[in-house]
């Protein structure tokens, strides 16, 4: 690979087959320009730009040491051939997986590339933006734009949804959090990206007609993005930890892919994942205990009581929704971020945090709730917050809160 300047990174470059999707194509990142820019936009010139739309359709199944390795791309193509998804959605998902690979590399090299710490800006929700928040948002946005298959994209880091330029525009809407748990970056703890995908819908509860600050395009974006989780076509997340894990559901089960550093491909490692029953782990931020409702306090206190079994629940909390939920998905138990006296509506965002992981957990045999099923809620604004309890023990906490 050709040498790059200190501020420019060349990631996942590999020759491209002339047929259909490519295994890797060159994405160039000028991180200095991205971090120094004001209003974030689709960067041309020497900024962040993604020239890839997906992974290889021609690599097929790789075999190693007598085991058959099925890549994410070959798995997506099988879903397409079976009529589960169409070719356009295959390209969108491939573009998302490419963005995740690039973000994984940026996260792993954050200390080397001076991408730790805050950017000095505040996002629409009043949160200090980390440098990697800004760069990851550009990576995700531009990979989706360059796929040519997305019409509207909405991000945690943007004030309003963005309509993709007409020359690149497609049919799908993608809502995403480019880097969940970014407060963990400096400590090299787990972070992740999550997303969901659906088709346009002209019905929305958002009252935008009287807002003079939104132009026609932005109004159309909001109308299309505010949809109930039951309209989802696909949802997933990518966790950046000791392994890079890509979890995906198309509404027909939960499938787990692990990034193989030898091939640079996501490889299928678990299929039709089901959340274990009778898990003994709870994940709540108990630093907020004094702010909780008395009913919730009683529930948590009872989890700590050994009872007749002599085995109390174990507390595990990372502070990254993706990391905490992934552990809950594998080991069972419950994850919760309730409303409290400080955050009366909860803290997690419905559209790009709660709804996607709730869709995943229901496909895995679990449940998510805020008192109603989160999957059925329809947002009234892009960054709407809701409380969340999710896992395989949700009915128990519902009884306490009733």
Swiss-Prot record:
Uppermost EC category: hydrolase
Protein EC: 3.1.3.11
- Its principal location? plastid
Q: Which residues are involved in binding substrate?
A: 180-183, 285, 317, 335, 337, 347
GO (cellular component) term, any one = cytoplasm
Instruction: Give any GO molecular function from the UniProt entry.
Output: fructose 1,6-bisphosphate 1-phosphatase activity
HAMAP family linked to this entry: FBPase_class1 (MF_01855)
Per UniProt, Mg(2+) 1 binds at 127, 156
Residues involved in Mg(2+) 3 binding: 177, 180, 353
- Name listed for the protein in its UniProt record: Fructose-1,6-bisphosphatase, chloroplastic
Pathway stated in the Swiss-Prot or TrEMBL entry: Carbohydrate biosynthesis; Calvin cycle
Residues holding Mg(2+) 2: 156, 177, 179
**Assembly and partners?**
Homotetramer.
UniProt cross-references to SUPFAM superfamilies, sorted A to Z: Carbohydrate phosphatase
Disulfide partners = 221-226
What are the protein's UniProt keywords? Calvin cycle, Carbohydrate metabolism, Chloroplast, Disulfide bond, Hydrolase, Magnesium, Metal-binding, Plastid, Transit peptide
Q: Which reaction does it catalyse?
A: beta-D-fructose 1,6-bisphosphate + H2O = beta-D-fructose 6-phosphate + phosphate
Question: Which family does the record claim for this protein?
Answer: Belongs to the FBPase class 1 family.
The further comment given in this record reads: In plants there are two FBPase isozymes: one in the cytosol and the other in the chloroplast.
Note on cofactor: Binds 3 Mg(2+) ions per subunit.
- Annotated organelle transit peptide span: 1-50
Q: Which cofactors are reported in the record for this sequence? A: Mg(2+)
Briefly describe its induction: Light activation through pH changes, Mg(2+) levels and also by light-modulated reduction of essential disulfide groups via the ferredoxin-thioredoxin f system.
